[in-house]
A protein has these predicted regions:
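Glycine-rich Rossmann-fold phosphate-binding loop(s) that bind the pyrophosphate
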Residues: 11-12
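N-terminal Rossmann-fold NAD(P) dinucleotide-binding loop
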Residues: 15-16
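Aromatic pocket-lining residues of Rossmann-like dinucleotide-binding sites
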Residues: 22
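Conserved N-terminal Rossmann-fold NAD(P) cofactor-binding segment
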Residues: 36-72, 306-314
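Rossmann-like NAD(P)-binding element
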Residues: 54-115
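Rossmann-like NAD(P)(H) cofactor-binding subdomain of soluble oxidoreductases
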Residues: 89-155
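C-terminal substrate-binding/catalytic lobe of Rossmann-fold NAD(P)-dependent dehydrogenases
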Residues: 134-140, 149-292, 296-315
Length: 315
């Protein structure tokens, strides 16, 4: 039986938490840690191995160069500059492109032919860049995109309505960043449209200030960043969920950034929308029927991604 092996490129706060989340949840057998700081990568591997006695599954962690990641089933790209509280995600593009220029030839040299889960910011632009310069099958590149934003949206709605977030279906779409939008016409509570519940049970489901809710969701990551210097647990859990869906061929519908090829009238970029995740990666993309206003907002968000994807090519 083939063991599941995941490589982590960038073993700082985020990458190390992804690795440990995979180990704790039993979604990996082997971890391969890679970082420009080789001592850190080795230390992260040692730390995980020290925890194995208290994990209910066998996990082996090693560290080494990117050129030796060819036998990994999945690569998690989490390398890049440290987050800056006063910097928009898009402003980190220059530093991230420099990392990509170093990493991509080394991935090619390794012979790696698996799946790539990209979680570095700016998420959608990085995934678009990786797909183009690796000349990869776009179905096999998934960016976490708005997976975490959508979780924050569900959390915020659950708080407002005093109801379990597990009963709420709600997505942030488009860019993982300032231009993200919410298709409010597709928000459901246990399968029932929120707009209907607001009419039938206004005491439980009051009218929302959509702009304020979305602003609170967008600022959520910055609150975490201000308090502890980085976001770790949320993105690690979201990444683990994506990898689980691939390894177990779950055919699970998750919000993530995937390659658009005509959906919503957009193509040639990665942007977030619900997608079916299974053993081939992105198996299908759910193109939601958006209102005219929602579609305009989604397209505005895609325009931001496209602008910075073009900019990345000039750096």
């Amino acid at each position: 039986m083939k063991l599941r092996k995941v490589g982590i490129i960038g073993t700082g706060h985020v990458g190390s938490h992804v690795a440990f989340s995979l180990a704790l949840q039993g979604e990996v057998d082997e971890l391969y840690m890679m970082d420009i700081d080789e001592k850190k990568a080795k230390a992260q591997a040692m730390d995980i191995n020290d925890a194995v006695s208290y994990i209910p599954h066998k996990v082996t962690a090693t560290a080494g160069p990117i050129e030796s990641c060819g036998d990994c089933d999945v690569l998690v790209f989490s390398a890049g500059p440290l987050p800056n509280l006063y910097q928009d995600r898009l402003e980190s593009l220059g530093d991230t492109v420099e990392v990509l220029k170093d990493v991509i030839p080394r991935i090619k040299k390794s012979g790696f032919d698996g799946f790539i889960i990209s979680i570095s910011n700016p998420a959608d632009v990085v995934a678009t860049y990786l797909c183009k310069h690796l000349n990869w099958n776009p179905k096999r590149i998934i960016s976490s995109g708005t997976a975490l934003d959508s979780a924050r949206l569900q959390k915020e709605l659950a708080r407002i309505f005093n109801i379990s977030n597990r009963t709420i279906t709600a997505y942030c779409l488009g860019e993982h960043g300032g231009s993200a939008m919410v298709p409010w016409s597709h928000v459901y509570v246990q399968g029932k449209p929120l707009v209907e519940l607001q009419q039938e049970l206004p005491h439980r489901f009051p009218t929302l200030d959509h702009t304020q809710v979305l602003d609170d969701v967008k600022i959520g990551g910055y609150h975490v960043l201000a308090g502890k210097g980085s976001t770790e647990f949320g993105i690690a859990s979201a990444t683990t969920e994506l990898i689980r869906a691939v390894f177990h061929d779950e055919k699970k519908v998750l919000p993530c950034s995937c390659y658009l090829d005509g959906q919503y009238g957009e193509e040639g970029i990665f942007a977030s929308t619900p997608a079916v995740i299974g053993k081939v990666g992105i198996e299908d993309i759910f193109e939601l029927k958006l209102t005219e206003e929602e579609l305009a907002l989604f397209k505005q968000s895609c325009a931001v991604i496209r602008e910075y994807a073009h900019k990345a090519e000039t750096l």
